[in-house]
A protein has these predicted regions:
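Mixed-charge, Lys/Arg-rich low-complexity intrinsically disordered regions
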Residues: 1-18
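Generic cytosolic/nucleocytoplasmic N-terminal low-complexity/intrinsically disordered segments
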Residues: 1-2, 23, 49
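Generic preference for hydrophobic/aromatic residues in regular secondary structure cores
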Residues: 9, 18, 41, 63-70
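Residue-level "contact hotspot" at macromolecular interaction interfaces
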Residues: 16, 22-23, 37
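Intrinsically disordered, low-complexity, charged/polar segments
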Residues: 55-77
Length: 77
């Protein structure tokens, strides 16, 4: 049987994020729903959904680093 483990994969700037990415915000792992930037591209609004389905928006500067998480499969012996 295979187990899925959530692991830290990388730190990304807001412009590297994609919808569906799993990121860490305030000790919670959330899913990116939408990403928008201001006219200058210096401030990004990242709309995200938590495990309870609640949607919130977090703002980041263009050079902030955001922890990206991914699921990996582990074979159980």
């Amino acid at each position: 049987m295979n187990n899925m483990e959530l692991v830290h994969a990388d730190n990304l700037t807001p412009d590297q994020l994609m919808e569906g990415d799993l990121i860490k915000i305030n000790d919670d792992i959330v899913e990116v729903v939408n990403i928008d930037s201001d006219a200058t591209g210096s401030i990004y609004a990242v709309e995200h959904q938590n495990e309870f389905g609640e949607i919130e928006i977090a703002e980041y500067n263009f050079d902030d680093l955001i922890p990206l998480y991914v699921f990996i499969e582990e074979d159980e012996e």
